[in-house]
Amino acid sequence: MTNRHYSSISQSAKWLALTRATTTIPFAREAAILLFGEAIVREAEATVANLSEHRLGHFEHRYRSIDQALVIVGHRNIVEIGTGLSFRGLAMAQSPGIHYLDTDLPELLAVKAELVARLDHPPLHGTLRLEPLDALAPGALAAAVRHMPAGPVAIVNEGLLMYLDASEKVRLATSIRGILQERTGSRWITADCYVRDGERPMALDPDVERFVAEQRVEEQKFANWGSAERFFETQGFAIARRLKPIDARHIRETWILTIT
């Protein structure tokens, strides 16, 4: 797709920030209050109280699956693509030896940088860098990674692939594969292995439902698990580990990928 307005993805990041505010995800509620005000956050809490247990837990489980994968991989250099208003880097950089590069498009990252400056958090014993980045721009991701300390890196994404069409997924995978080739032992951790769900419940917010339709989110998920596996294999990756959520509907997994 050409001439796409990628900044529109930030709409979902803001909606997700309100949803996460109702969870135990680090800094989620505090950031949402700073961004939207406490009254709006309380309204969001009342709204999600009407959602099913599956919907309530989905985003927290997805977030925590990345944490679990990072523990399994054990890398201290971490690059997160399209972080939105997630503050995983702020939480992880409290540990010594962590070098966390937090990236997103410039407009959203500017909002996030202001929030990070205002949030009350423990001292950082590691390093947190916030850097504007269009991960689909040729060479941009590789250039950003070159400024990381020596050693393997974990490339992380959560809530991104379903906004990319087939050609964009290929471009991103090609960039990431190049980094994994340059840095021996590196891994790609993606929480975005979604398959299409014909029984997906409607969101309570019509604006959210409209956004999902406009972005063709359901269409851009993988058709089935075989399709997801073939995509990554075709792009030169092997699945090192599959983290499956406790969810009877089983529409999403987090995968740890290495190069073949």
Predicted region positions:
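Rossmann-like AdoMet
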Residues: M1-V79, T83-E131, G139, P149
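A short, conserved alpha-helix within the catalytic core of class I
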Residues: A140-L141, Y163-G178
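Core SAM-dependent methyltransferase catalytic element
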Residues: K244-T260
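Conserved beta-strand signature within the Rossmann-like core of class I S-adenosyl-L-methionine
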Residues: A154, A173, G178-R196
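Acceptor-substrate binding/catalytic loop of class I
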Residues: L164, R210-W225
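A short SAM/SAH-binding and catalytic strip from SAM-dependent methyltransferases
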Residues: P152-E168
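A short acidic, Gly/Pro-enriched loop at the edge of an enzyme's catalytic core
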Residues: A142-I155
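Short alpha-helix
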Residues: E218-R242
